[in-house]
Amino acid sequence: MKKNYLFALTLTMWLLSCAAAEDPNKAALKLNPKPNLMNIITDTATFGEGCFWCTEAFFQRLKGVKEVLSGYGGGFVENPTYEQVCDKNTGHIELARIVFDPNEISYDELLEVFWKTHDPTTMDQQGNDIGPQYRSAIYYHNAEQKQKAEKYKAALDKSGAWAKPIVTIIEPFKNFYPAENYHQNYYNNNQNQGYCRFVIAPKLEKFEKVFKDKLKKQ
């Protein structure tokens, strides 16, 4: 009986893990349409806050965000696959590359969302997602982003908002490799999948209450 219970518990934890991906050959995937950015001055932010399915879902909903792409970065293997990253031997982190219009939403506002939508005190872990690919990370693209990220982190540390030290890495942007197509627009394509229903959906509900004034109109 105990063995059956442990098996059921292990299976449940796996089903609620970001690593339990859908079949990559699944048909009828809906990718986000590429926005026309020719006449818009945009900037880029690159964040890692655990499973990129969650990160993508948060930032997609913000006014001023033009594109969110899930991918891998920070490591040393070129064009890694999801399986390689999950093997934890590439040095890569699951990331979201966020293209935004700074006239509609600022980098400071994106940082606020970043810090408030994950636990920056757990090393290589977010909930049931465990491994170096789930590290909390900010990859800055210029000196101004570096200064703002470090200032926000220092203020959080000083405020005592978290009982444990913040372990988020703040490093210069190194590289970014887009993830496979089935990872893109993941929550919107797979809302009935277990991880989406039981992990992402409750987080989104909370997110939409906290940031209701910053959301795109549905």
Report the location of each language-model feature.
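Flexible coil/turn and secondary-structure edge motifs
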Residues: 18-218
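Bacterial Sec-dependent N-terminal signal peptides
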Residues: 1-27
